[in-house]
Amino acid sequence: MNTFSQVWVFSDTPSRLPELMNGAQALANQINAFVLNDADGAQAIQLGANHVWKLNGKPDDRMIEDYAGVMADTIRQHGADGLVLLPNTRRGKLLAAKLGYRLKAAVSNDASTVSVQDGKATVKHMVYGGLAIGEERIATPYAVLTISSGTFDAAQPDASRTGETHTVEWQAPAVAITRTATQARQSNSVDLDKARLVVSVGRGIGSKDNIALAEQLCKAIGAELACSRPVAENEKWMEHERYVGISNLMLKPELYLAVGISGQIQHMVGANASQTIFAINKDKNAPIFQYADYGIVGDAVKILPALTAALAR
């Protein structure tokens, strides 16, 4: 048997739902989707869900992952085994841990390949900081996986599809985290997964102010802006949602223009599927040039304005 009888999908990020649903279609006979609202439910059905389970009643001061209890109960009530697919977002991983505990299921994070052999999930993902690929065969009846962006192509919606909708009511967990305040985060996030052209900056750009040079290039060629993990996580120059690498975005654009990025394996795992890689780096020995189809050795701060002017003609 090379499919599960049931797969359960949930995404806290709506843009990740189509790829998870495409993966679900390849891995199971029946697709169930947990959703937070009616609009997401309608989308899930168009993407192939046979059953939609609307999570309902969570107090405003509680976290989405506190639905784990009723989600696990619902999963158990509808089969003695099954596969759970979640995005590898921070919330997705928190929810995966809670579901794994409640379902007594193995949890595998950042999966880049998923297959089913003899009714068991086989998962591949990066290990040792991206230096190797590990393969795991999950033996527990339930398997909970967080999926790296780009692992599956996005499913295409079909408005003619039909499915059944159910409601799952909130049940307060015995131990819960209560949200005491929220702070809006300014973000210009885009769906980088769908971008044809990507300009990505690393710490070699020099400063946060210099990112404006990359933004001007993006405007000139119609590209989207991304970054390396240190730019987002260490320097805080850009949003977390824009960093490319093993634990976040896995992109497949037509062009990936890496500016001031050294090219460590942890980053290149997220960019190496690009059709063409163009690198700008002042270090001629930077690892990025081992991956690049084209490269310029030089100061990005000087090269970017000239490149922008040439391409804007």
UniProtKB/Swiss-Prot annotation:
Pfam families on file: ETF (PF01012), ETF_alpha (PF00766)
GO biological process entries: carnitine metabolic process; fatty acid beta-oxidation using acyl-CoA dehydrogenase
Keywords, ordered alphabetically: Electron transport, FAD, Flavoprotein, Transport
Binding residue positions for FAD: 255-283
Gene Ontology molecular-function annotations: electron transfer activity; flavin adenine dinucleotide binding
Function in brief: Required for anaerobic carnitine reduction. May bring reductant to CaiA.
HAMAP family (UniProt xref): FixB
Family, per entry: Belongs to the ETF alpha-subunit/FixB family.
Protein name: Protein FixB
